[in-house]
């Protein structure tokens, strides 16, 4: 395949989306199911790995081996409170590997564990394939988005996931900034406007304030919560119904993973219904121990269950306004992004906060982020299209960055909401006489003491010549690149000795070797997926060929055109093959192909004879079926064996 353009990928907690900029406009690309967003789900079964819709459709049957929300684990520690509380809601197993979380699943009959970055990389691979199928070209360059409030390790984890999936990540950009690009281009903003992006998705929440003027997008401030979204609203509803079930039936379903998963699917559906109706009913047959669960929930009750979470979305709005030094009256446009902004109560709270100002719903909340990422990908690849060539993006770093100085004090070198890329240098000195070295510990966060902030990494600068305290001059430089990822260096001015680290967050990061290993594993898994797909395709081909052959020779219209002996010969062979198929569903591709050849050996001469005697196609024969045509081989890329029928609660 020839080389395709760079794409923009919105790697979401619950859904992902991919877009490409070509012929002067953005195309959001639909997947093989015709959906423009793809669930960020990866499932492992006895025979195969499923990604996207296929994985989500079978989650009720296979809850413990279906991984979702990998984003919520990316770049976090196992003991992180967030990880611990999420684990209570997930049916799959999360294990502690050297204080890093890994998900544990059964795949092809063995136990396997994956880093969250690997799971995210599988979702990215799927998005890459969706783009390649549409473009008919290979895709290797991408811009990937992260929540604006993501810290350094979460950004780095996303970049690693891209590398593992075989993508060259041009840049990591913030979701609300990407959405602002979509808005700015859509609205053709000319004169300066202050725009507030309110982005509430499935797993994270961001508020960013930008000034847009003639193609320059300048982020003034950003705030948010990387752990608040639609999933949390679902959790509240699930807990509410578990309690109701206990009350009505005196049984606790919370330990039954399949029951909880079916309930969650129903809750997610009910939540969506409540955005347009004031009541939703839930009907789940035989939810637990044969008990049917029929109930309903009103919009008012749903709002009450989530009252604190909904109201809490206004805190980051206030913080972003304060940091941007703006009054709410100075905001020209309030733009809604992310599926959860469809919730009427959230819209009402936001509108009331801005004194009744109309909210802007002109951009598609599910696709805006991928749209903006695709535009940025085109710019970085040098697209000369007039609508994008003058576009300039000035983003900011969301958290203050600094080092620990005497007494555990956080000394900030780069304040939050500083435009990136940026570089700051500050000179420090020693704390005691003849101190031979200094330990440089790098932190991010807003608290005065480092113990309350997040340690990103540390390194030592040694070999400082003996001198009284306060004499040596150690120059520390923080350098943040366009991805929002930081390099730190320290130099002793007297000797010129230097030491530096890229903050690869030793605690939460994959080493280069890890990543290389995972890249190879990803290729191996992909090859296995392809083998499985070919196998299913060969099996389906054989099956449809056998059945078509049968129905062809049994056709009334062929009476007298084919001898009973020939007819019986074909029927016997077809029945033999169909019987073999029933017993050998898991055979290898070669075996299916061998059976097909054997069957064709019997059928082809008879069918050819039939053609010649009939002078062409006999009437009523399914056109072009018999002969060497391997039945209705599943289209390559079909993934699963025909449509999976899902249980709809």
From Swiss-Prot:
<feature type="binding site">
    <location>
        <position position="271"/>
    </location>
    <ligand>
        <name>ADP</name>
    </ligand>
</feature>
<keyword id="KW-0963">Cytoplasm</keyword>
<protein>
    <recommendedName>
        <fullName>Heat shock cognate 71 kDa protein</fullName>
    </recommendedName>
</protein>
<dbReference type="GO" id="GO:0005829">
    <property type="term" value="C:cytosol"/>
</dbReference>
<dbReference type="GO" id="GO:0031101">
    <property type="term" value="P:fin regeneration"/>
</dbReference>
<dbReference type="GO" id="GO:0048260">
    <property type="term" value="P:positive regulation of receptor-mediated endocytosis"/>
</dbReference>
<keyword id="KW-1003">Cell membrane</keyword>
<feature type="binding site">
    <location>
        <position position="14"/>
    </location>
    <ligand>
        <name>ADP</name>
    </ligand>
</feature>
<dbReference type="GO" id="GO:0005730">
    <property type="term" value="C:nucleolus"/>
</dbReference>
<dbReference type="GO" id="GO:0044183">
    <property type="term" value="F:protein folding chaperone"/>
</dbReference>
<dbReference type="GO" id="GO:0072318">
    <property type="term" value="P:clathrin coat disassembly"/>
</dbReference>
<dbReference type="InterPro" id="IPR029047">
    <property type="entry name" value="HSP70_peptide-bd_sf"/>
</dbReference>
<feature type="region of interest" description="Nucleotide-binding domain (NBD)">
    <location>
        <begin position="2"/>
        <end position="386"/>
    </location>
</feature>
<dbReference type="GO" id="GO:0005737">
    <property type="term" value="C:cytoplasm"/>
</dbReference>
<keyword id="KW-0072">Autophagy</keyword>
<feature type="binding site">
    <location>
        <position position="339"/>
    </location>
    <ligand>
        <name>ADP</name>
    </ligand>
</feature>
<dbReference type="InterPro" id="IPR018181">
    <property type="entry name" value="Heat_shock_70_CS"/>
</dbReference>
<keyword id="KW-0472">Membrane</keyword>
<dbReference type="Pfam" id="PF00012">
    <property type="entry name" value="HSP70"/>
</dbReference>
<feature type="binding site">
    <location>
        <position position="268"/>
    </location>
    <ligand>
        <name>ADP</name>
    </ligand>
</feature>
<keyword id="KW-0547">Nucleotide-binding</keyword>
<dbReference type="GO" id="GO:0051085">
    <property type="term" value="P:chaperone cofactor-dependent protein refolding"/>
</dbReference>
<feature type="compositionally biased region" description="Gly residues">
    <location>
        <begin position="616"/>
        <end position="641"/>
    </location>
</feature>
<dbReference type="GO" id="GO:0140662">
    <property type="term" value="F:ATP-dependent protein folding chaperone"/>
</dbReference>
<dbReference type="InterPro" id="IPR043129">
    <property type="entry name" value="ATPase_NBD"/>
</dbReference>
<keyword id="KW-0346">Stress response</keyword>
<comment type="similarity">
    <text>Belongs to the heat shock protein 70 family.</text>
</comment>
<dbReference type="GO" id="GO:0040036">
    <property type="term" value="P:regulation of fibroblast growth factor receptor signaling pathway"/>
</dbReference>
<dbReference type="GO" id="GO:0005524">
    <property type="term" value="F:ATP binding"/>
</dbReference>
<feature type="region of interest" description="Substrate-binding domain (SBD)">
    <location>
        <begin position="394"/>
        <end position="509"/>
    </location>
</feature>
<dbReference type="GO" id="GO:0061740">
    <property type="term" value="P:protein targeting to lysosome involved in chaperone-mediated autophagy"/>
</dbReference>
<feature type="binding site">
    <location>
        <position position="15"/>
    </location>
    <ligand>
        <name>ADP</name>
    </ligand>
</feature>
<dbReference type="InterPro" id="IPR013126">
    <property type="entry name" value="Hsp_70_fam"/>
</dbReference>
<dbReference type="GO" id="GO:0005634">
    <property type="term" value="C:nucleus"/>
</dbReference>
<dbReference type="GO" id="GO:0031072">
    <property type="term" value="F:heat shock protein binding"/>
</dbReference>
<feature type="region of interest" description="Disordered">
    <location>
        <begin position="614"/>
        <end position="649"/>
    </location>
</feature>
<dbReference type="GO" id="GO:1902946">
    <property type="term" value="P:protein localization to early endosome"/>
</dbReference>
<keyword id="KW-0067">ATP-binding</keyword>
<dbReference type="GO" id="GO:0016887">
    <property type="term" value="F:ATP hydrolysis activity"/>
</dbReference>
<feature type="binding site">
    <location>
        <position position="275"/>
    </location>
    <ligand>
        <name>ADP</name>
    </ligand>
</feature>
<feature type="binding site">
    <location>
        <position position="202"/>
    </location>
    <ligand>
        <name>ADP</name>
    </ligand>
</feature>
<dbReference type="GO" id="GO:0031076">
    <property type="term" value="P:embryonic camera-type eye development"/>
</dbReference>
